[in-house]
Amino acid sequence: MEIFYIPSTGGGQLHCRKWLPESKPKAVVQLVHGIAEHIGRYDHFARFLNQHGYIVTAEDHMGHGGSIVGDLKGYFNGGWMNAVADVKALHDKTAAEHPGLPYIFLGHSMGSFLLRTYLYTYPEALNAAIISGTGWQPAAALKAGLALCKFEEKRLGETKTSPLLNSLIFG
């Protein structure tokens, strides 16, 4: 397993990993992790995929795992679209290193939402996508949730964790 860093769209460095198979690779799988996670949690799964001939790569989103800057845990500098652009930056680097191989994304939980945004923003960039642990909410619930998020951001500032939102999301 190789650890490396690439620049984040919003500033800072993304902590990345790449697992290489011992056999000739069949394809690349890029993992997009969920909220309150880090790529280290996927080590066993990445090694399993390696045993079946897949290159696996992933980045800790800004504010997660090895990409936390100071006390900005969970914070995407510049917002959601910067996190999506960071996923693309790792894709572009990895695809250039392994030209001609099929490229598969696997997004889990919050990573599934990042991947869904990625799919409609950069549809040409992949051969397949696996969306795991995703969800769908009625428009009214989404609007109410967004309004609450904006209220908490104004109340606390964009870099602070909201105990209320944390409780609503994680219980």
Question: Each predicted region: which residue ranges?
Answer:
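N-terminal cap/lid segment of alpha/beta-hydrolase-fold proteins
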Residues: 1-23
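Short beta-strand element of the alpha/beta-hydrolase
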Residues: 26-34
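Active-site glycine-rich loops that stabilize anionic/oxyanionic intermediates
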Residues: 34-37, 109
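Conserved alpha/beta-hydrolase
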Residues: 41, 46-70
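Alpha/beta-hydrolase active-site loop
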Residues: 77-95
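Alpha/beta-hydrolase fold nucleophile elbow
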Residues: 98-109
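Glycine-rich nucleophile elbow surrounding the catalytic serine of serine-hydrolase chemistry
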Residues: 107-117
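Alpha/beta-hydrolase-fold enzymes
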Residues: 115-171
